[in-house]
Amino acid sequence: MIPGQYILAKEDIVCNGDKKVTKVKVLNQGDRPIQIGSHYHFYEVNEALKFDRSVVIGQHLNIPAGTAVRFEPGDEKTIELVPYSGEQKVYGFKNKVDGDIQSYTKRGR
């Protein structure tokens, strides 16, 4: 082994392979670019992004951690989302959910 050498696996690395993927068409109707990070709760993104929010509660972008998707004004893209893992609780962002995803869905938005 050489110091600093990378030894990589021969097979591809699969992220979120066991998660249900939701595809959503998104349109930026605003006049400014909007960038969404990999772990941002997509339900709570900028209101200038138009899409069916009811299908994205509890989900984030299906992209590598630390990356983002950028929507220029007028851009329309189909993106992939995956559900959060763990306890299915979301806190912060725009404080729309602030708790259990299932409870939020049941009590109505």
Swiss-Prot record:
Its EC number is 3.5.1.5. It comes from the Bacteria. Pfam families: Urease_beta. Its main location: cytoplasm. One of its GO terms (cellular component) is urease complex. It catalyses: urea + 2 H2O + H(+) = hydrogencarbonate + 2 NH4(+). Pathway: Nitrogen metabolism; urea degradation; CO(2) and NH(3) from urea (urease route): step 1/1. Coiled coil: none annotated. GO terms for molecular function: urease activity. Gene3D superfamilies: Urease, beta subunit (2.10.150.10). It is found in: Cytoplasm. Keywords: Cytoplasm, Hydrolase. One of its GO terms (biological process) is urea catabolic process. InterPro entries: Urease_beta-like, Urease_betasu_sf, Urease_subunit. Belongs to the urease beta subunit family. HAMAP family: Urease_beta. Heterotrimer of UreA (gamma), UreB (beta) and UreC (alpha) subunits. Three heterotrimers associate to form the active enzyme. This is Urease subunit beta. It comes from Bacillus cereus (strain ATCC 10987 / NRS 248). The lineage of its organism: Bacteria, Bacillati, Bacillota, Bacilli, Bacillales. The gene is ureB.
